[in-house]
C-alpha cells in the first residue's frame, strides 16, 4: 500500500490493452515487438514487448529512444508529460517506454492505492508512506542504473490489465477512524483524526503509529509520548490499548487478528 503525504506521481499495473494500442501508435516503428503487439494485443505479445524493450542494446536502443523522444514533440498530456519528466533523469533508459504500458496514477494527499504482487510499479515524484507485506524478492524493471534480471522479471510478472480507476483504495469512515481496505491479510491500515478528547486505539497485534500531520500524544498508564509530523512509535502487542489525543492525523499499521 502507498499512502500519499504530498501530491504523488506513480505508475502501477498494465493499462487496458486497447489503451496501450492507442498510445503505441506514434512510436509503432520504434521496435518490431511494438508492431507485433499492435497486430495482436494480448498477454503473450505484451510479455514479448516488455522483454524486448528491456533487452534493447546499442544502436537498436538508441534508435528506439530517438523515435520515442521525437514523438514527444507532437504529443501532449499524459502519459507523454510523465515521459518528459523521467527522461530528465534517465534519458537513455528503456524504461522511458513504461508510461505507455503502465497506468500513470496521480494521488492527492490522503489517497492510497494497493500494489499487487507480480505487478510492475514505480514511484516517480512526491512523498508517501509505504506499507509492505513480507516479501523475499524485489525485481527491477527499469529506471535504474542497477542490474536488471530480465528473464526472472518476465517469469514473475502477470501480464494482465488493471483499469486505472480501480487502483485507488476506497476508505471506509467509522467515526474518527478512516479504514483503508486491504485485499490481503498481511496488514491493515487506518487513519485517525485527533482531538483534545482522548481516544482509545486497540489491536491484538503489534502496531506502528505514524504522525501524518499536527501533533499526537500517546498515553499508556503514567507514560506519555509526543509525536510530531514524520515521527512514529512502535506499540508492542502486550502494550495495547493506548490512548491518543492531539491535533491532526495519525496513521496506524497493524494486523487484524
Segments from the language model and where they lie:
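Positively charged, Gly/Ser-enriched RNA/tRNA-binding surfaces
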Residues: 79-80, 87-119
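A short hydrophobic beta-strand segment most commonly corresponding to one strand
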Residues: 1-11, 126-145, 187, 247-257
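Long, charge-rich alpha-helical interaction segments
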Residues: 23-89
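C-terminal, non-catalytic macromolecule-binding modules
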Residues: 127-179
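Short acidic-glycine-tyrosine-enriched beta hairpin
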Residues: 104-114, 119-123, 129, 220-239
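Glycine- and acidic-residue-biased ligand/ion/polar-headgroup-sensing regions
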Residues: 1-12, 16-18, 76, 80-84, ...
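Generic C-terminus detector
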Residues: 213-257
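Conserved short histidine dyad/triad with adjacent acidic residue
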Residues: 173-176, 185-203
Amino acid at each position: 500500500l502507498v499512502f500519499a503525504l504530498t501530491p504523488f506521481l506513480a505508475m502501477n499495473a498494465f493499462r487496458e490493452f486497447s489503451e496501450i494500442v492507442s498510445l503505441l501508435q506514434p512510436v509503432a516503428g520504434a521496435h518490431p515487438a511494438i508492431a507485433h503487439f499492435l497486430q495482436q494485443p494480448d498477454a503473450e505479445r505484451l510479455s514479448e514487448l516488455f522483454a524486448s524493450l528491456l533487452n534493447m542494446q546499442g544502436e537498436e536502443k538508441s534508435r528506439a529512444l530517438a523515435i520515442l523522444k521525437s514523438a514527444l514533440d507532437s504529443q501532449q498530456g499524459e502519459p507523454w508529460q510523465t515521459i518528459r519528466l523521467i527522461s530528465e533523469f534517465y534519458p537513455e533508459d528503456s524504461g522511458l517506454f513504461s508510461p505507455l504500458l503502465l497506468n500513470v496514477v496521480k494521488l492527492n494527499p490522503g489517497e492510497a492505492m494497493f500494489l499487487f504482487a507480480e505487478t510492475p510499479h514505480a514511484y516517480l515524484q512526491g512523498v508517501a508512506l509505504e506499507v509492505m507485506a513480507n516479501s523475499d524478492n524485489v525485481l527491477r524493471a527499469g529506471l535504474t542504473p542497477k542490474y536488471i534480471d530480465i528473464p526472472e522479471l518476465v517469469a514473475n510478472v502477470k501480464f494482465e490489465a488493471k483499469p486505472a480507476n480501480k487502483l485507488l483504495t476506497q476508505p471506509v469512515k467509522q467515526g474518527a477512524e478512516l479504514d483503508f481496505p486491504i485485499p490481503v491479510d498481511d496488514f491493515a491500515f487506518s487513519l485517525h483524526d485527533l482531538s483534545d478528547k482522548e481516544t482509545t486505539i486497540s489491536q491484538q497485534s503489534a502496531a506502528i503509529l505514524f504522525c501524518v500531520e499536527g501533533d499526537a500524544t500517546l498515553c499508556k498508564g503514567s507514560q506519555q509520548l509526543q509525536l510530531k509530523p514524520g515521527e512514529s512509535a512502535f506499540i508492542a502487542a502486550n502494550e495495547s490499548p493506548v490512548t491518543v489525543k492531539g491535533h491532526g492525523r495519525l496513521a496506524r499499521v497493524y494486523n487484524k487478528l
